[in-house]
């Protein structure tokens, strides 16, 4: 038997805030009347995937690294300890590295903040933030294709207002390192967000891009298919975009929150490479595959941050 005496009533108020405009823009949130408890979920932006390299047929090449995923922080507070208005800045995801002949790194994401004033420069005013360091972008295949760094956990000073609540910081996940060998370098799910999978490398034959391996109710985000050989200019396929359980039409989900990165682009020895897949909120973009001279795939964009405030 289930007793519902202590379950929250229908007055629960959920508000969701997305990145918009400039990365330095702030929202304001006003505490509803009769609110007793406040839960805050604060997720930063994920890193963009690196672009894949390009070279003449038969030469070994490396795919771009996947972007890292952001850390996140949750906070649970008695509403009486919070001011009537708090301010929110939602981080943006990093751009993927440009494809073609540019062979560039992905950009880092940016942090998300919840503060008692519209500034992130006064540490004592910050209620919670998504992490200490933002998720890093994946390196280009021509720069060894390293995976983007994971967003680190936030360790706040005891002088912060956060001491009035229960705070749980969680680290992100490193992006996958760009491939050179035929076996795809896949991402294993380890938490709420994932890094991006890397782009495919090659010696003389096109290869499949890295995937994000599914588990339980989460499906696999499949890497882009392999392209052709030196005598076949079939392009590598683009990596798949993200899988997520959120948002829904009601801002609620039937499953736990989950945000995947993008998968890696496929490679082609004689043609253009596949692009990395785009990421869900806070996750890393997929790395671009490698291709013929000047035809490396671009990296996928990192997912924007997200702040969810629940009041009851």
Task: Please identify what each model-predicted range represents.
Residues 1, 5, 138-139, 194, ...:
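Viral virion structural and adsorption modules
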Residues 1-34, 39, 78, 160-166, ...:
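Enriched but not universal
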Residues 16, 20-32, 42-117, 140-155, ...:
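Glycine-rich strand-loop-strand elements at beta-sheet edges
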